[in-house]
A protein has these predicted regions:
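Jelly-roll (double-stranded beta-helix
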Residues: 2-204
Length: 204
């Protein structure tokens, strides 16, 4: 993960992914920009990832990029929302922090409801193990399983680390308690190929 680093007080199974270190990359169709949070295997391009989590900024109406054999979960995190047409069927996305699933390779057109939006985008290869996406608030215990935690608004504390808005923490080991001061995404990741390598170079 570019920019990932272990927190100095933390065990090596935890990798901090600061929002400030992400680079904006234009969509392949030019309709917006994306900032990758994490992906596996490390260094995989858009044609080779097993899973990928990013924040996507949509500034204008138009089609979404198509990703063959990819499933996606989209969560609106900023803005009024979108009126989508997915494979000819209308889908209104106008409520923040509600994950919505749809195929990544079906023609999808977007009409903004009231200006630019930001979406949390989780994608994975069809036929592989699907990540889970939940938006939580308050205090809860996360089990010992791979997960990516992204503070969406209000910040969060876990594993001795304080997350600001859009900061993320990759967890690959022990139980931990999450204190989510505002909406916080928890992306459950199976031990898919590439996950161990994702944190290997970040460990002490």
């Amino acid at each position: 993960v570019a920019g990932g680093r272990p927190h100095p007080r933390d065990r090596p199974v935890t990798v901090l992914l600061p929002a400030a270190e992400r680079v904006a990359v234009a969509w392949k169709n030019g309709g917006g920009v994306t900032r990758e949070i994490a992906a596996a295997p490390p260094g995989a391009d858009m044609a080779a990832f097993a899973w990928r989590v990013s924040l996507a900024e949509v500034a204008a109406d138009g089609p979404f990029s198509a990703f063959p054999e990819v499933e996606r979960t989209l969560t609106l995190v900023e803005g009024a929302g979108m009126d989508l047409t997915v494979g000819g069927r209308r889908r209104l996305v106008d409520t923040r922090y509600v994950p919505q699933d749809f195929p990544g390779d079906v023609p999808t057109d977007c009409r903004l409801l009231g200006g630019p939006v930001v979406n949390l985008n989780v994608m994975w290869r069809r036929g592989g193990a699907a990540p889970t996406v939940a938006v939580v608030r308050g205090r809860l215990r996360l089990p010992a399983a791979p997960a990516l935690v992204v503070a969406l608004d209000g910040g969060a504390d876990l594993a001795g680390v304080r997350l600001g808005r859009y900061d993320a923490l990759l967890l690959t080991g022990e139980d931990t308690v999450l204190h989510a001061h505002g909406p916080t995404a928890v992306v459950g990741l199976t031990p898919a190929r590439g996950l161990a390598a994702l944190t290997h170079d970040e460990r002490h």
